[in-house]
Amino acid sequence: MVSSEDFYLRTNNVSHMKVVITGGCGFIGSNLAHELVDENEVVVIDDLSTGRLENNGDLLDNENYRFVKGSITDLDLLKQIFDGARYVFHQAAIPSVPRSIKDPAKTNEVNISGTLNVLIAAADNNVTKVVYASSSSVYGDTPVLPKEESMVPNPLSPYAVSKLTGEYYCKVVTEIYGLKTTSLRYFNVYGPRQDPSSEYAAVIPKFITKALDRESPIIYGDGEQTRDFTFVKDVVSANILAAKSSETGIFNIGGGKRVSINELAETIIKASGTGTDPGLTHVEPRDGDVKHSLADISRAESIIGYKPSYTLDDGLKETIGWFIE
């Protein structure tokens, strides 16, 4: 993993590099804040609609950390916050396929208009680079595996449409205004600080919570659908590598291996250490879910130097340990 020390630009009479993390109290944003705060001035903006203040509770007294409660839909606020920033890590979003289907208008407002605001504010403040959190959902249910960045997108939900639109805005802003941008297509990120309590929580924290409570995990569909799961520390590393790189464009960020949801659930039950097997509960599949997903990460490996450091077993062990604590 790339360390914050590698990322820190050491220059005379400058104590820290300023970086801004939108959605920095969320799952991925808070992990990124913890990685960068020792050697950088980290400013987090989050409206706490899905992020949690306690994710960065241990940073509140850190002189390198500053929290601003606000929304990326507030362009004037973003322009103020981005003043003097070297990099912007844009993680803020409504991060859920089911929620986007339930409320497409709000998803559009935050994920599309909010992203455009981030890009405008960054360009106006001469930010060196914006790293944008996109999603593997832009590929849709294309049967070809693994997913390559050159594939024609086929979004199946308002969330996926919003993430793809954000990529297009990044590309256009780079070409017209000269702001360097990189879009990272995340594949099923998991790890510490991921909220299991939300109605729209991701599968791994839900499964872990069920396993620790000795309850049967709920699986949508037959469970034979497959996913490429990526540990959050590898995603943090990818963000830092993308920021440091002079390259722009789109990169898949995944683990490079896939596992069925049934197998995932069974692995989590065993790794939970409860000594019980509550079995699996299957229910009707959800709208907007894809059948199979697997990242081709060769472009990220060759261009920005990304290489996943955590196997699924390693990542689950650390994640379950965090939930137990």
Predicted regions and their residues:
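N-terminal Rossmann-like NAD(P)+-binding domain of SDR-like oxidoreductases, especially those catalyzing
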Residues: 3-189, 233
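C-terminal substrate-binding subdomain of Rossmann-fold SDR/epimerase-dehydratase oxidoreductases
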Residues: 6-7, 212-325
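Generic structural signal for alpha-helix termini and adjacent loop/cap motifs
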Residues: 31, 51, 103, 121, ...
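Residue-level signal for the nucleotide or nucleotide-sugar donor/cofactor binding architecture
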Residues: 51, 73, 102, 110-113, ...
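Residues in well-ordered alpha-helical elements
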Residues: 76-79, 86, 98, 105, ...
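A conserved pocket-lining segment of Rossmann-fold NAD(P)-dependent short-chain dehydrogenase/reductase
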Residues: 100, 150-154, 181, 185-195, ...
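Aromatic/hydrophobic pocket-lining residues that form π-stacking "cages" and hydrophobic walls in ligand
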Residues: 118, 170, 207, 238-239
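Hydrophobic alpha-helix immediately C-terminal to the catalytic Tyr-X-X-X-Lys motif of short-chain
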Residues: 165, 169, 173, 203, ...
